[in-house]
A protein has these predicted regions:
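Conserved AMP-binding/adenylate-forming
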Residues: 285-287, 294-434, 442-444
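Structural core segment of the AMP-binding/adenylate-forming
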Residues: 49-50, 77-146, 260-261, 266, ...
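AMP-dependent adenylate-forming
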Residues: 6-31, 162-164, 171, 321, ...
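Conserved pre-ATP/AMP-binding loop-to-beta segment of ANL
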Residues: 17, 148-166, 172-173, 183, ...
């Protein structure tokens, strides 16, 4: 097995291969594979020149896709450990952003942070305020490598840590997942060849954030590993104007793209007939969905909305994964239409995924497919007891995509990775060998001895007239008497006095 850096070096002979960067201002920059490899070597040389040594952690806060990707690959090529940090999105939340940067720097031990001229003053201010000793270097200085004459860095080992992927921190403080070069090679190969069945004729289109594993591994590392060309769009440009995503697929003749569930809902709602009229989306063969709960109604609405543009039902490709498994764990069949399972809600709350008979409350779940070859997936009950077909339990995984644990946190590593299995914290069941995700174990709401999934409550509330689509959250807390109660927070499009009563009625009526 070769490292990603070995593969990238060998692929540099393909002068007909390139990546395209669309910057925030709209201009496009095309970088061929030979130039990509040369630039990675040059920047790795510059990083060594500023004092970085092999194994040192280096934080990256770079908003533009080309700046980030070229510097990230350079860090891997030089044997440094990259630490991606998302760039600030709004001035209104700078205090919270500063807290995040300081936490990641402290947790990773990074003593160098590379950013832009524009962001440097703000970042330095927050580091001084937090008494951080990290040195801030501008990307421009890494770009201009004095004394570089094309020399290659020392080779990296498969078991070296390539980068730290910090978790989202949705249920705890963000932790740095140690992703090795072996993890990257194994998972990239599985994604591109087992999951996507890709060839060099494929073309990827992505607006996904590059500091997140789906954007970084799924559309930088894996495609470069497999000689697949990619067009990168600025994330915020998609959020402001969703039509840019589908327009890029049309223009670039994209065959592979991925997005979270919310993006499909946003595009369905926001794209106008005038924008879509000239598109031909028949080129798209793998329209992947993951990173958050997948709603089948949203995917069907998206397919229906763009069927006239040639989008095919079998192009929808649900998947499941997490940073602790590098990226991907399961893929649905890339050649088959969407598969769903409608199950009885009462039975599921009792831990059984029984198909609905049509009577009583039910919910529809999406198949996320099967685990990759060479990996073992099991659904476990309490105490690590393997569960059978259609029994709901926690997803456990073992295999070469499972990462090396959390950097500097042996207790959390033992809790999640101990005993040879990755305990994902996700609840699911298997049916006919395929995985159906139900929710997060830590998110379960237990009322009067019954289990309720927040996603079920949120799905019901989102359908109520007056509630903004996707803008609600359900959770539990304990009241003054010590009893667990359910709480729903929802954003309304208008001030409706009876909305709270409507929410209570709808949830009680369906659950």
């Amino acid at each position: 097995m070769r490292t990603f850096i070995d593969v990238l070096r060998d692929n540099a002979v393909h002068s007909d291969r390139s990546v395209t960067f669309v910057r925030a201002a709209g201009e496009e920059r095309v970088v061929g594979y030979p130039d990509l490899w040369h630039e990675a070597q040059r920047r790795a040389h510059a990083m060594a020149a500023i004092g970085l040594q092999r194994g040192d952690r280096v934080a990256l806060v770079l908003p533009e896709p080309d700046e980030f990707i070229l510097t990230f690959i350079a860090a891997l090529a030089g044997g440094f450990v990259a630490v991606p940090i998302y760039p600030p999105q709004t001035l209104a939340k700078m205090e919270a952003y500063g807290d995040t940067v300081r936490h990641v720097l402290a947790a990773s031990g990074a003593n160098v942070l590379i950013t832009t001229d524009a962001l440097r003053p703000m970042i330095e201010e927050h580091l001084v305020r937090g008494a951080s000793t990290a040195r801030v270097v501008v990307e421009r200085d890494v770009r201009s490598a004095a004394g570089f004459e094309g020399q290659s860095p020392e080779p990296v080992s498969l078991d070296d840590v390539a980068f730290l992927q910090f978790t989202s921190g949705s249920t705890s403080s963000p932790k740095g997942v140690m992703v090795t070069h072996r993890n990257l090679s194994v998972n990239s190969h599985a994604i591109m060849f087992d999951g996507l069945q890709s060839t060099p004729a494929d073309r990827g289109v992505s607006w996904l954030p590059l500091y997140h594993d789906m954007g970084l591994i799924g559309f930088v590392i894996a495609p470069l590993y497999a000689l697949v060309q990619v067009m990168f769009l600025p994330t915020m440009a998609f959020i402001r104007r969703p039509s840019l995503w589908l327009d890029a697929i049309h223009r670039f003749r994209g065959t592979i793209t991925f997005a979270p569930n919310f993006a499909f809902a946003l595009a369905t709602r926001a794209v106008t007939e005038g924008q879509a009229r000239s598109w031909d989306l028949s080129c798209m063969r793998a329209l992947g969905c993951g990173a958050e709960p997948i709603q089948p109604d949203v995917l069907r609405a998206f397919l229906g909305r763009f069927a006239a543009q040639g989008l095919r039902p079998e192009s929808i490709l649900p998947s499941y994964g997490m940073a602790e498994a590098t990226l991907a764990i399961t893929f649905a069949d890339v050649t088959a239409p969407l598969r769903t399972d409608r199950i009885d809600l009462a039975a599921m709350r009792a831990g059984q995924a029984r198909p609905s008979s049509g009577d009583g409350a039910a919910m529809e779940l999406v198949s996320c497919g099967r685990p990759f070859p060479g990996h073992e997936l099991a659904v476990m009950g309490p105490g690590g007891r393997p569960l059978g077909e259609r029994q709901v339990g926690e997803v456990w995984l073992r295999g070469p995509s499972v990462t090396a644990g959390y950097y500097g946190d042996p207790a959390a590593t033992e809790e999640t990775f101990g005993g040879g299995w990755l305990r994902t914290g996700d609840l699911a069941y298997q049916a006919d060998g395929e995985l159906f995700i139900c929710g997060r174990a830590k998110d379960l709401i237990i009322l009067n001895g019954k289990n309720y999934y927040p996603q079920d409550i949120e799905r019901i509330v989102s359908r109520i007239d007056g509630i903004r689509d996707g803008q609600c959250v359900a959770f539990s807390r304990f009241d003054d008497a010590g009893a667990e109660i359910a709480v729903v927070v929802a954003e309304s499009r208008r001030n409706t006095a009876g909305l709270a009563a409507a929410i209570v009625s709808a949830v009680r009526g369906e659950l």
